[in-house]
Amino acid sequence: MSSLPTPSSAASLPTHSITSHALPDATLGGSAPSRSIALAGASNFRDLGGYIGHGGQQVKWRRLFRSDHLAALTPQDHAVLAGLRVARTVDFRGQAESAAYAYALPGVAYHPLRIEPTVIQRALDLQRSGHQITAQDAVVLMQDTYRGFVNDSAPRFAGLFELLLDSDAPTVFHCTAGKDRTGFAAALILMALGVPRDVVMHDYLLTNALYQRPQGMGTHAPDDVLTVLWRVQVDFLEAALHGVEVEHGGLDNYLERVLGINAAAQKRLALLYLEPSSAAG
């Protein structure tokens, strides 16, 4: 029977030396900053700036960054982050993941908001019961994982918003691959700022063009299963957003009743992270 990586091995991600290059983005003007930031030790590091939110105002560049884990950053990468004036990181990785690949960035505040990865454990449970996991099984597991973000992980996402509302100091939030926990967090932030849902989905799917899966990771699992587990799909994020709508009556209700982001807090979020109207566009 083929085996999937255990949760502990999933945490043990080998470093990589693939440098990501700026990804052309048709939504950006020619003089706009690069969305994807080239780092030797993180392939999925990118800026949420430039999208158009409430009132036609643009999300500020160089304030909100999403990424895969930061434990493999090189000294040159550290210099890039210093140049970006990164002041704090938010780490969504579970305890084993963050312990296996810990990091510390000089002068940068570290905020762990643990969301334990469950999809690998559930896949292992299926295998132990005698079921050979298929790609479709993996899709269902991923959708269930995203549904769990909406309620089970709500306190962690509330913690992220609390930090963002405290100041607009440049912030990197990340998990291991920067695609699922980080992807839902980025979607919440952008939608709270008024970025249209189709644009949010566009940003979410950029992971498939950028993220480099660590070499040798999960090689005993079928390739089609690995493709599901290490990439993102529209249906994954839609599963979470559907839960927000059906269970909570929409984004505004979810933000206020579940995450504690009321109208005043949403207004402050916009003040901190959207360019003034005269500077938008």
Predicted regions and their residues:
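Cys-dependent protein tyrosine phosphatase-like superfamily
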Residues: 2-171, 184-281
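Ser/Thr-glycine-rich phosphate-binding loops at phosphate-binding pockets of nucleotides
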Residues: 177, 181-182
